Regions:
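Short, polar/acidic, helix-capping and beta-turn segments at strand->helix junctions
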Residues: 1-100
Length: 100
């Protein structure tokens, strides 16, 4: 199987990997782990979990839209939070989903 790799505009451009991988001839798209960083790789949100969540979801939107998809097309999304505690759940939910 052939794989197309993409670094979409609007996301940082890492040297070691690509942000999006598409299994050619299928509808399977794999997005690299998205964190609270802007297109230039600068951290966004500081210690504000809601702001970090918003940026990470914005990055997911950019990645999936780069191949013609939307959040409606995502089958699985895994979220990792450093130093998780149940008290952080409300802040995690404050991250607003970005629609264009």
């Amino acid at each position: 199987m052939s794989v197309e790799v993409i670094n979409p505009d609007g996301l940082s451009k890492p040297d070691m990997y690509r942000q999006v991988s598409v299994a050619v001839g299928t509808r399977h798209v794999f997005i690299a782990g998205q964190v609270a960083r802007d297109a230039d790789g600068r951290p966004v949100g500081g210690d504000d979990l809601a702001a970090q969540t918003e940026q990470a979801f914005r990055n997911v939107a950019i990645a999936i839209e780069s191949v013609g998809g939307s959040f409606d097309d995502i089958a699985k999304l895994t979220v990792y939070v450093v130093d998780w505690s149940p008290e952080k759940m409300a802040a995690l939910g404050e991250g607003r989903c970005v629609r264009r």
